[in-house]
Amino acid sequence: MACTENGLAGHSHSPIIVPVDKNRSKETCHNVQLRSLSSMLKDDEDDADVWTRPPVSLRPPFNVPRTGARIPQNPRAPRHPLTLTPAIEEESLATAEINSSEGLESQSQKGHDSINMSQEFSGSPMALMIGGPRVGSRVLERSGNNSKPYIPVPRSQGFFPPRGSQSRGPPYIPTLRSGIMMEVTPGNARMANRGNMAHVSFPLGSPRHPMDNWQQSPSLPLSPSITGLPCSSAHCFLPPQAPAFNPFPVMPTAFASPLRFGPPLLPYVFHYNTGAMYPPPYLN
């Protein structure tokens, strides 16, 4: 029986051997080494050379130069340092002031129209301005579509009184109140500081002369005899019949005693006679 190597002679690593008999039938033979020791050592050296050699890349090397982490510069940006001259600074400040003033004016015009009363001088006429820019003495500071109608208001028809304290005394009109004639002298309203007092005159029958008022009053009529009164009707007074209106009643007025059974009370009787009083019937 002869065994042949399956594959290339001396280069096969397979341990399987296929024997060939006379009838050229193939049989497998295991665990049979056909290679020599020299060939095996040569294969080990080739493997060591493969592992020790550096890897060879198929592509050419692509190296990017790294100069550090930097932000790429804008090619459109100016590369020279920016320096401000005094002329540029003044121009920028003026531009900023103009922009701020225009912004404030636009904000003021967006609001609702407000009525502003202004009087520049004490002697100048009062002016009424409805919205828009400030109005001077008949001259608009700004002209154009933004200007509002200017309405001059004469002095006599102003909404507010003119400046300055103008104190006027009350008119010289005598006033009659409650039978007292009061006359106030024209002048300053502060009468207490100057010592001016109002002149008060009382008509006839005033509290200063009570006798005149008592004499002018009609005689008090006597009441007719009333049954049940303990006193006679000659000593009881009735109130007067609607006397004239007097704001200062000083004289006492006699009233009739109430209708009750018993001795009358002293405050209700102006004149009473003790001899004419009789004891009540239930005391007898």
UniProtKB/Swiss-Prot annotation:
Pfam families: DUF4645
Superkingdom of origin: Eukaryota
Membrane-crossing segments per the record: none
Region (Disordered), start-end ranges: 59-80, 97-119, 143-171
InterPro entries: DUF4645 (IPR027891)
PANTHER family linked: PROLINE-RICH PROTEIN 32
Protein name in UniProt: Proline-rich protein 32
Species annotation: Mus musculus
Gene that specifies this protein: Prr32
